[in-house]
Swiss-Prot record:
UniProt keywords, alphabetically: Cell membrane, Membrane, Transmembrane, Transmembrane helix
Gene Ontology CC terms: plasma membrane
Protein name in the entry: Uncharacterized protein MJ1189
Topology versus the membrane: Multi-pass membrane protein
Subcellular location: Cell membrane
Subcellular location, principal: membrane
């Protein structure tokens, strides 16, 4: 096995290996982020208007509903773009295992869409598998709340299992995603093989990658958070602020653009570990 620094350095340089392909991904991600932000803002305005019409001046329900319908179509477009991006991440992982050292092409969009959709479905199924037991414990606890001690015990055990299952899912799904990129949909569920690949080095790598991604995203978001707190919020006279809306959209665009690069970085680092670990286990 190579040192963890190798995976991190390689993943960093890999992200910058083809500027044009990276920009394409960043712009697609930004488009999806902008549409999603606008949809969320319109939905929020509609809810605020229904609760307190005085907070949204000059708009009636017809205008808001029309805007929501248009935004919903936009949301579907954003969802499709999201599947394409997920398909590209799958291609990044697959080509990494195949020893390619540059960002893959954006060709065969239909294939990216298909692989991205299956990637999404696979992750949902994994979430259900890992979360079903703790959720059932919590539900039983709620139904047994009339028996205070029994209900509280079930709920407590449920939340404890939920915490453990969440950690287990986060550890498992990184390698499962790479396995899917190599072997197809069934690769998500090769539990024995994937758990064999997990060791302390992998967990440390996962933590480091996670911290790097979180820090980068926080640094990108921080100027917009400070702007909203110190410049926009004190000047607001209503719940809805056009200035804050513009800041939210710009923040979503920039965060999504950077998010594409951090996602590629993370997928590359984990795929490199997967490749080396598979070779090591074969010996």
């Amino acid at each position: 096995m190579k040192k963890l620094e190798y995976y991190l350095k390689d993943a960093f340089y890999y992200v910058l290996s083809d500027v044009k392909k990276g920009i394409v991904g960043g712009l697609l991600s930004s488009t999806s982020g902008a549409i999603g932000a606008i949809f969320g803002i319109i939905l929020s305005i509609l809810l605020i208007h229904n609760i307190n019409p005085n907070d949204v001046v000059g708009l009636d329900n017809n205008i808001l509903l029309t805007s929501l319908i248009v935004a919903s179509f936009g949301f579907l477009i954003a969802l499709i773009i999201g599947f394409i991006l997920d398909g590209y991440y799958v291609r990044v992982m697959k080509t990494t295992v195949e020893n390619y050292d540059v960002l893959p092409d954006w060709d065969d969009i239909a294939e990216l869409l298909k692989r991205g959709f299956l990637y999404w479905i696979g992750n949902i199924i994994l979430s259900i598998i890992f979360m079903i037991v703790p959720i059932l414990f919590i539900i039983f606890g709620v139904f047994l709340i009339f028996l205070p001690l029994v209900g509280i015990v079930f709920i407590g055990i449920g939340f404890l299992l939920l915490f453990v299952s969440t950690i287990a899912l986060l550890i498992y799904e990184g390698l499962a995603e790479v396995n899917y990129s190599v072997k197809g949909f069934s690769g998500f569920f090769e539990f024995k093989e994937i758990f064999r690949m997990i060791n302390l080095n992998y967990i440390i790598l996962l933590i480091i990658v996670g911290v790097i991604v979180i820090v980068i995203n926080f640094v990108v978001q921080l100027p917009f958070i400070l702007l909203k707190i110190f410049a926009i919020s004190p000047a607001r006279y209503s719940t809805f602020s056009s200035s804050e809306t513009i800041v939210d959209v710009i923040s979503a665009v920039i965060s999504a653009f950077v998010g594409f690069y951090t996602a590629v970085f993370a997928k590359r680092a984990i795929a490199l570990y997967y490749k080396d670990r598979v070779e090591e286990l074969k010996k």
